[in-house]
């Protein structure tokens, strides 16, 4: 159940940003103790909100919660708790950034009724997808704050919605940046002129903030995206007062997108991916994306919340009319969007140097609320000679090889994927990174398949007492990443463990820790802000991840103490992949970090090792000046910042 249900709620967990809130709160707490003016920071109230959010997230990990094996009304209660936690964590993030980003801390003034910032997305109820707010522009610059939750310096593509296409974006250094303007669509073919999506590449410090400025100008240098819409009854030119939109008939010709790393071919009939050419070696790789349905058996025992009992192999997803296909060509990204009856499928290619240009962003908005005993899967077929072997991650930490066995029934060959799954042969590895946990299989050589949603009408006699009919419209987000392998040997294929490449780890980190955009709540009269806030002296090593920096509760009451838990994880990675020209803005240091060089604005007063759960300190625990960790280890330290 965990891997196939409640995808909407799992998507919400990603949006919870509980780690970002914990880290920002810990830094804001230290900042607030530095002067009298900043002591009005609502540290106790926010600590209570953090604690409650932590408990709600923990509750949702219950074996009948995240698995979807609860009655409908119980699921609504879980969803409502998550929804409240998201609201509360947003408040903690906003309050914490307020105190950290002010240039003159003496001007700090906390007013509970008017927040200093607002997030760029709103969610109307616990069972709906969030949507972006529209930022109103004037000739006066409007601050756009971008928070980078990863511990490495980052170049990331950021999109926000604004109310005017005459836009200029200034970087934290005050220089104009290249902007792409894309249409915001109502449905498949109608352009909304109430909002415009602007996209640019942001450069952000590790765990830090960059303050960009948006303003309306008479003549904008932003580049408009062009659109081709493939549909049955097409008129040649579709008049629009801003965008160039061509309407075409669905055709047997391919749709082509490319950037400096790869070239992609899509079918002109279905809009689905067919082939990738990697420019590094000039090779073509067949890469067919398709959808498929699973039914359930005609026996007495049928699929339900616990059981997957398919009626044989999946049937291809057949559409009588070709879908509407909308192709966007832009300076920063191009994309192909296919509108099928049950799924809106988007493949986006970023035309940027570095990490984001090297993988394909795939998103599916799935709606099977009108179906009867059916399950929808996305399948990727390649010519990789995977020999029935594929790899999935356990809890985002280790990767485990899986073997598809023909002697087992189909359902026994489906495995959980928490953050990634891959197949490989001597020359290449194809990784599917995921932002939500799902079930994955590799039923044929060179194939990966992900089950996206299930709708089952009957109970399967395991104690739930109902079917699975509370489906929601769900967003699934993936990254598809093809890499070359060097110097592999045959014995390695039989090893019991495998590791992602460094680039793969970073791609997964970008996907699971997206940049958080915010704007100032007031249009004018905003006090002066720092142009950037960088709490770390430099990027952490590429293989080091700050799992959390969490303020420890005081022993007396539900209020914060002056200590925090710094939890670090050193990732294991496979060296048989090139790291040259990958756009990684960090290095590796064999797991060593100098403590006094860690933080920039704050001084480390003490750092002592503790057990993972902070319950125990070793008897010889003393103040460390250097952190030294082996690969694949997680360590917890008690840290005091000043």
Spans of model-derived segments:
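Metal- or metallocofactor-binding catalytic centers and their adjacent structured scaffolds
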Residues: 1-128, 140, 489-501, 507-514, ...
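C-terminal (or distal) subdomains of carbohydrate-active enzymes
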Residues: 15, 94-642
């Amino acid at each position: 159940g965990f891997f196939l249900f409640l995808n909407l709620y799992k998507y919400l967990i990603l949006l919870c940003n509980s780690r970002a809130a914990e880290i920002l709160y810990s830094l804001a707490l230290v900042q607030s103790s530095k002067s009298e003016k900043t002591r009005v920071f609502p540290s106790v109230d926010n600590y209570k909100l953090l604690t409650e959010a932590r408990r709600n997230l923990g509750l949702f990990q219950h074996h009948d919660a995240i698995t979807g094996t609860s009655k409908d009304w119980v699921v609504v209660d879980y969803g409502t708790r998550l929804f409240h936690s998201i609201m509360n964590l947003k408040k903690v993030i906003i309050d914490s950034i307020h105190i950290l980003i002010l240039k003159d801390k003496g001007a700090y003034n906390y007013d509970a009724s008017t927040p200093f910032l607002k997030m760029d997305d709103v969610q109307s109820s616990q069972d709906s997808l969030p949507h972006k707010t529209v930022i109103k522009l004037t000739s006066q610059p409007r601050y756009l704050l971008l928070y980078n939750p990863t511990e490495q310096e980052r170049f990331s593509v950021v999109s926000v919605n604004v109310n005017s296409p005459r836009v200029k974006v200034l970087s934290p250094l005050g220089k104009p940046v290249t902007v792409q303007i894309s249409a915001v669509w109502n449905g498949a073919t109608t352009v909304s002129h109430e909002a415009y999506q602007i996209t640019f590449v942001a450069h952000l410090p590790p765990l830090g903030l960059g303050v960009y400025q948006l303003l309306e100008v008479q003549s904008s240098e932003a580049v408009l995206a062009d659109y081709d819409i493939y549909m049955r009854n097409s008129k040649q030119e579709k008049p629009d007062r801003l965008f160039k939109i061509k309407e075409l008939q669905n055709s047997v010709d391919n749709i082509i997108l490319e950037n400096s790393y790869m070239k992609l071919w899509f079918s002109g009939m279905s809009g689905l991916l067919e082939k990738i050419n990697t420019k590094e070696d000039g090779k073509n790789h067949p890469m067919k994306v398709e959808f498929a349905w699973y039914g359930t058996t005609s026996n007495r025992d049928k699929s339900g919340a616990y059981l997957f009992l398919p009626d044989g192999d999946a049937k291809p997803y057949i559409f009588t009319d070709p879908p509407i296909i909308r192709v966007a060509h832009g300076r920063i990204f191009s994309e192909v969007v296919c509108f099928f009856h049950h799924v809106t499928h988007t493949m986006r290619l970023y035309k940027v140097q570095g990490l984001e240009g090297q993988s394909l962003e795939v998103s599916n908005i799935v709606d099977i609320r009108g179906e009867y005993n059916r399950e929808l899967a996305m399948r990727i077929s390649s010519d990789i000679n995977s020999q029935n072997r594929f790899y999935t991650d356990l809890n985002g930490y280790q990767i485990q090889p899986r073997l598809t066995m023909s002697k087992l029934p189909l359902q026994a060959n489906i495995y959980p994927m928490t953050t990634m799954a891959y197949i490989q042969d001597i020359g290449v590895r194809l990784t599917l990174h995921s932002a939500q946990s799902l079930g994955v299989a590799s039923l044929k050589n060179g194939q990966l398949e992900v089950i996206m949603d299930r709708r089952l009408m009957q109970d399967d006699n395991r104690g739930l007492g109902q079917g699975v009919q509370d489906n929601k419209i769900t967003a699934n987000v993936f990254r598809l990443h093809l890499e070359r392998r060097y110097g592999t040997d045959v014995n390695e294929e039989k090893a019991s463990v495998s590791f992602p490449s460094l680039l793969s780890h970073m791609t997964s980190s970008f996907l699971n820790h997206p940049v958080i955009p915010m704007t100032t709540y007031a249009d004018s009269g905003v006090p002066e802000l720092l142009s950037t806030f960088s709490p770390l002296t430099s990027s952490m090593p590429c293989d080091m991840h700050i799992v959390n920096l969490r303020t420890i509760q005081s022993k007396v009451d539900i209020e914060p103490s002056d200590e925090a838990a710094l939890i670090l994880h050193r990732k294991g990675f496979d060296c048989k992949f090139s790291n040259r020209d990958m756009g990684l803005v960090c290095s590796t240091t064999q797991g060593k970090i100098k403590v006094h060089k860690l933080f920039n604005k704050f001084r480390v007063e003490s750092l002592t090792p503790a057990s993972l759960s902070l319950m125990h300190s070793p008897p010889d625990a003393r103040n460390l000046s250097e952190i030294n960790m082996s690969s694949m280890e997680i360590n917890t330290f008690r840290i005091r910042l000043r």
